[in-house]
Design a protein with these regions (language model features):
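Residues forming the flavin
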Residues: 1-539
Length: 539
């Protein structure tokens, strides 16, 4: 059985003449009805009336099905209403051929409807992934929250304060992490890796490998006795190398789950932790655990990564001790950081002069040609934090353009100016080791029209956000990425939270730079989309 009825949309954006196309289709023996634009009230009324007055199998020829397919399907009731995209057709011949091809396809007779799985996989336990998981679970949907790190929380858990309100980051994030862990419909799978994704929307099979912690999570109480006796000291990745830690440790004080982990590559097998643990939680024979999950939808909240500052060698990162990244600065001023919040250089010296350099990697055709969005306001926030710790510190921000476009961001910028933060337009050419100061920044003031050398104790590089490019193992090809490596969407305006794979959704910075509030919004947005998806049967 094939279709022979066409509902032709008189969309003003079509590149072909609708009446001419209707005439050609009529001459081909088809029943054609031209409707006002179907995305208008008049067009919707016309479509409803047409389907009621002339029942049967219709085909809609309009703009892209990605934009309005769901709307057309709802109006079709029980029937199957395919949509042919005419926006891509430049000539009458091509438009006619596309419609005739679609009309020639067989119509499935009485397709079996299978209820989709009412479970969802969320990949990434940052604030966006946690928000999506909580919204889904609160709607009665089972969630598997997979996080590659030892704790959920993501980058936000490493920050001291958030902008523009300067709230304590972990103070507002911590309760959300605890809520996610305690929710009866959320299963945390931390220190885990997705090893396979197969299937389709409503019916995905996902393989997950849980790496061994060498600690029994059901017995560990997070007391830290094991770390106290461990003799192996290694750099702390959580503190970005600014502090050391033990081979066995809890990743940070507010970690969820609050469980110790042994990194076997550093372990010398002294078994002192085994003796020190009063709860018999140490299990040196742990093996990886394999899980198979059946889910109806997948949320990718895998985040982004900071630009590698070593590429900008003129700034001396990794060579000059006083040159830090903006995330390292956050750890330096954080009360739970390597100095317990004491504002000092990595060498332990007081900070009297501080400078921020913007757009490190961003807005540079050699590296990241786009604006990373968050960096200007983050640097202003960090300048205010420096003044909170040391009111007499001299703070300078070297900028390309100040872009504070979020709610309350411009007000924070004005507060920083009033507090004495100096803004110099122009990105420095290089950073040198100084004779009378740790560092000297060589710059050109584009507004003042002069060159200068600024002695500072610390220079903070505001890094752009780059795509992580971590590929997930989709059996039939994963979501398409854009030119910069971020996940793309079928439509950047109408379907910005969806990937190019049906049933796979995007939250947070995996699809482009975002700040925390935007990331939280995307988490809630994908949850709403999935709740609607899992209501419907799937063929």
């Amino acid at each position: 059985m094939t279709r022979s009825q066409v509902l032709l949309c008189a969309c003003p954006d079509l590149k072909v003449e609708v009446q001419d196309l209707a005439q050609r289709l009529t001459q081909a023996g088809l029943k054609v009805r031209v409707s006002p634009p179907l995305c208008t009230p008049a067009g919707l009324q016309e479509q409803r009336a047409r389907l009621q007055a002339e029942p049967g199998e219709w085909l809609v020829a309009a703009c892209g099905p990605a934009q309005h397919h769901g709307l057309f399907q709802r109006l079709a009731g029980e029937g199957i209403l395919p949509v042919v995209n005419l926006l891509e057709e430049d000539h009458l011949e091509g438009a006619e051929a596309a419609i005739l091809t679609a009309l020639g396809e067989e119509i499935p007779v009485a397709p079996g409807e299978v209820l989709p799985h009412r479970e969802v996989l969320v990949v990434g336990g940052g604030v966006g992934g946690c928000q999506a998981a909580l919204d889904l679970a609160n709607a009665g949907i089972k969630v598997y929250l997979v996080e590659s790190s030892l704790s959920i929380g993501g980058t936000m858990a490493q920050l001291d304060k958030t902008f523009p309100t300067l709230d304590c980051s972990i103070c507002i994030l911590g309760p959300k992490l605890v809520e996610a862990a305690a929710h009866p419909l959320i299963e945390l799978l931390t220190y885990a890796e997705v090893t396979g994704i197969a299937g389709r929307a409503g019916h995905f099979s996902v393989d997950v490998t849980l790496k061994p912690r060498y600690v029994d999570m059901s017995k560990c109480v997070g007391c830290g006795n094991c770390a106290e006796v461990c003799p192996v000291i290694v750099p702390s990745r959580w503190n970005l190398g600014l502090k050391s830690r033990k081979c066995i440790r809890i990743i940070f004080a507010q970690a969820v789950p609050l469980v110790a982990t042994i990194e076997k590559e550093y372990c010398i097998d002294c078994q002192m932790c085994l003796t020190a643990c009063e709860h018999s939680a140490i299990d040196l024979n742990c093996q990886p655990e394999e899980r198979r999950l059946e889910v109806g939808a997948v949320v990718l909240a895998t985040g982004a990564k900071p630009f590698d500052p070593a590429i900008r060698s003129e700034y001396g990162y990794g060579r000059l001790p006083g040159v830090l990244t903006n995330l390292e600065f956050e750890r330096l001023v954080c009360a739970t950081g390597p100095t317990q919040g004491y504002f000092q250089t990595p060498a332990g010296q007081p900070v009297k002069r501080l400078a921020f350099i913007q757009c490190v990697g961003s807005r540079d055709q050699r590296f990241l040609p786009y604006c990373s969005g968050y960096c200007c306001t983050a640097a202003i926030k960090q300048a205010m934090l420096a003044l909170e710790h040391e009111p007499d510190v001299e703070v300078t921000i070297f900028f390309n353009d100040i872009r504070t476009s979020g709610k309350g961001f411009e007000e924070l910028y004005l507060r920083a100016q009033a507090a004495g933060v100096r803004f110099i337009k122009g990105l420095p050419g290089r950073i040198e080791a100084g004779e009378d100061s740790p560092l000297v920044i060589v710059y050109e003031d584009q507004r003042g029209g002069h060159r200068g050398r600024l002695p500072v104790d610390l220079a903070v590089l505001s890094l752009g956000l780059a795509a992580s490019r971590q590929e997930l193992p989709f059996a039939e090809g994963g979501p398409v990425r854009d030119d910069q490596g971020f996940y793309g969407s079928p439509h950047p305006v109408l379907q910005s939270l969806e990937s190019t794979v049906p049933g796979v959704f995007l939250a947070g910075t995996c699809q482009g730079p975002r700040d925390i509030s935007e990331t939280v919004c995307t988490g809630s947005g994908v949850a709403a989309r999935i709740i609607n998806l899992l209501k419907r049967p799937s063929a």
